[in-house]
Amino acid sequence: MHCLQVVIAIVLYSFGKISAENANCKKCTPMLVDSAFKEHGIVPDVVSTAPTKLVNVSYNNLTVNLGNELTPTQVKNQPTKVSWDAEPGALYTLVMTDPDAPSRKNPVFREWHHWLIINISGQNVSSGTVLSDYIGSGPRKGTGLHRYVFLVYKQPGSITDTQHGGNRRNFKVMDFANKHHLGNPVAGNFFQAKHED
């Protein structure tokens, strides 16, 4: 009976019906994160190396879970919770990006960043400097599923950046990470969304 409960929890979790806390996200191993990032092409479309940990992202009672599908209406507003395994006193960068703009078949605007915050103290997102305010997903009709990727980078120190934020299209998170010596992302997650009538 216990095995059946675990299977049901995993299925519900993968469809975003229950929170990460209830589904025991300690099961999200580096191998699972790496596998999902490669299976969905985030490696190599967005990053060259998958993060080793999960960033937990919730929109009210819906949880982002390694490629589950959410609607633009469900993610219209900024997430209600964003957390990751942070080191006390460390600074972090959080980015949400869409590599499928305007479509996955024709990503001429790759990437379109939807949210960019630097100098986050620990995992206190509100303590960071917002370079780009949050914009929810909004795929155009006929463009299919888009991947919306959350990445967290540990910073080597405080960042001063005035060049990013205004122009959202053709943003390259790897270029941003290289410019600021961020290395590979320490945590990540993603959902998918398509046009909603």
UniProtKB/Swiss-Prot annotation:
It comes from the Eukaryota. This is OV-16 antigen. Belongs to the phosphatidylethanolamine-binding protein family. Glycans are attached at residues 56, 61, 119, 124. PANTHER family: PHOSPHATIDYLETHANOLAMINE-BINDING PROTEIN (PTHR11362), PHOSPHATIDYLETHANOLAMINE-BINDING PROTEIN 4 (PTHR11362:SF82). It comes from Onchocerca volvulus. Keywords: Glycoprotein, Signal. Hypodermis, cuticle and uterus. Disulfide bonds: none annotated.
